[in-house]
Each structure stands twice: as C-alpha cells, then as structure tokens.
Design a protein with these regions (language model features):
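Short beta-strand scaffold segments in enzyme catalytic cores
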Residues: 26-35
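Non-catalytic interface/targeting segments
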Residues: 9, 32-33, 48, 129
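Zinc-dependent deaminase
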Residues: 1-18, 82, 88-150
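Short, flexible loop/turn motifs enriched in small residues
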Residues: 21-25
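Immediate flanking context of iron-sulfur cluster ligation sites
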Residues: 69-81
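A short, polar/charged loop-to-alpha-helix boundary motif
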Residues: 44-57
Length: 150
C-alpha cells in the first residue's frame, strides 16, 4: 500500500474537491480486491447540511448497493483516520484493509479496526496533513462540529 495506489490517489482527489467546495477536506475510495474503484467520495457535511455524510460514508453510498461479498477483500482508502461512525461502517461491511493518509490531525477507531481483524496502514501523507491544517486554521468551529466536539 502506497501513495501511488489508484485508490489513495482518488481519495486525495476527493479531499481536494471537498476543500475546493469549502467543505471538510477528507476523501475516501473503496477499492475491490482486484483493484477496481467501487466508490469514491468526500466529506459533504457542510455542503449538504448532513449529520453523517463523512468521506467514507460518501464512498460507500456512491458504490451503491453491492452484494456482501464485494466488500470482503476490499480496501477503504481515506485521507484521515476514520471516526467511530466510519470505523463501524468498515467493520459492518467486512472491509479487509483501511489505508489512512494521515493520523496526526485526528486518530479515530484504528485500534478497534485492528481488534476486529482489519489491517490498518498509515501513510503519513503531507498533502493530507496540509489540507487538514489549512481547514482547521480557517474553520475551527466546523472542524470541531465534524468530530463531535464543542
């Protein structure tokens, strides 16, 4: 797993799209075991006034209704460590691996993923860190809301 994987590139593109829209710059892509991008998306909470439309949920939604077997063996690429909600979605659908762009800004459910037998890979990507740093500096209140803090 590396920064050159098509799934990670798609996730970063989605994060940039979210940033360009004025939203939380987090992107994700769900990739099948054979390397096909099943779905990709970005955090749309601000753009759609949504309580739940985080990047991973957006990627799952954009993948559409799939048979359970499609998720097994799949990899979720995400630009930031997944929150508890997105961690739960990965566990529920039986995703095999979660590849994280960075986890310095926020550490979500990585340990829980590991406990549930899901491989976790952290890339510490500078672009992901820069996008989050800029967003948090410009919109600290929106960031705190996104992660459920006051």
């Amino acid at each position: 797993m590396s920064e050159r994987d098509a799934g990670f590139i798609a996730a970063v593109e989605e994060a940039q799209k979210g940033s360009n829209e004025g939203g939380v710059p987090i992107g994700a892509a769900l990739v099948s075991a054979d390397g096909k991008i099943l779905g990709r998306g970005h955090n749309m909470r601000l753009q759609k006034d949504s309580a739940t439309l985080h990047a991973e949920i957006s990627a799952l939604e954009n993948a559409g209704r799939l048979p359970a077997a499609a998720y097994r063996g799949a990899t979720m690429y995400t630009t930031l460590s997944p929150c508890d909600m997105c961690t739960g979605a990965c566990v529920m659908y039986g995703v095999k691996r979660v590849v994280i762009g960075e986890n310095k800004t926020f550490v979500g459910g990585e340990e829980y993923l590991k406990q549930r037998g899901i491989e976790v890979v952290v890339l510490e990507n500078e672009k992901c860190k820069e996008l989050m740093k800029k967003f948090i500096e410009e919109k600290p209140g929106d960031w705190n809301e996104d992660i459920g803090e006051d």
